[in-house]
């Protein structure tokens, strides 16, 4: 039982078959660990993310001062890393296994992108608990795009991508169900 009705699904799949430039792909996967404080715990999150992804993370900084949480504006409070191409697809496949390949319709935005979280990094297959590091949760954001989206990001001759070439929520759901064998729950 899918969230997208069969008629809409059929139209979307026919559209992708007739024009390969309309078939979506994974643009990037962003993995974020929000620690909420700087110091030793943030450094451990940095090392964990580097170990899980094989890439060097960047620190995310506080946007504003909040004395009740003990953070100042500009202070590093989290780490994130962007994965692209094959590395992104492999990591996404690995993390989807940790959530039993189930996503909710509310996790998709209007442009077909999807975000989900892991409460504990040890839910990932092959990752063991290390008392030195502790347990961290993480957010995984998947950005879907069609071929040709570079037009709106490139430096020269930048142009907007028309509404008809952007992804919809339904297309994002169908793509995740078809490519990653995900069950989308209402």
Swiss-Prot record:
One of its GO terms (biological process) is translation. GO terms for molecular function: rRNA binding; structural constituent of ribosome; tRNA binding. Keywords: Ribonucleoprotein, Ribosomal protein, RNA-binding, rRNA-binding, tRNA-binding. GO terms for cellular component: ribonucleoprotein complex; ribosome. PROSITE patterns: RIBOSOMAL_L5. InterPro entries: Ribosomal_uL5, Ribosomal_uL5_arc, Ribosomal_uL5_C, Ribosomal_uL5_CS, Ribosomal_uL5_dom_sf, Ribosomal_uL5_N. The keyword Thylakoid does not apply. NCBIfam families: PRK04219.1. This is one of the proteins that bind and probably mediate the attachment of the 5S RNA into the large ribosomal subunit, where it forms part of the central protuberance. In the 70S ribosome it contacts protein S13 of the 30S subunit (bridge B1b), connecting the 2 subunits; this bridge is implicated in subunit movement. May contact the P site tRNA; the 5S rRNA and some of its associated proteins might help stabilize positioning of ribosome-bound tRNAs. Part of the 50S ribosomal subunit; contacts the 5S rRNA and probably tRNA. Forms a bridge to the 30S subunit in the 70S ribosome. PANTHER family: 60S RIBOSOMAL PROTEIN L11-RELATED (PTHR11994). Belongs to the universal ribosomal protein uL5 family. This is Large ribosomal subunit protein uL5. The lineage of its organism: Archaea, Methanobacteriati, Methanobacteriota, Methanomada group, Methanopyri.
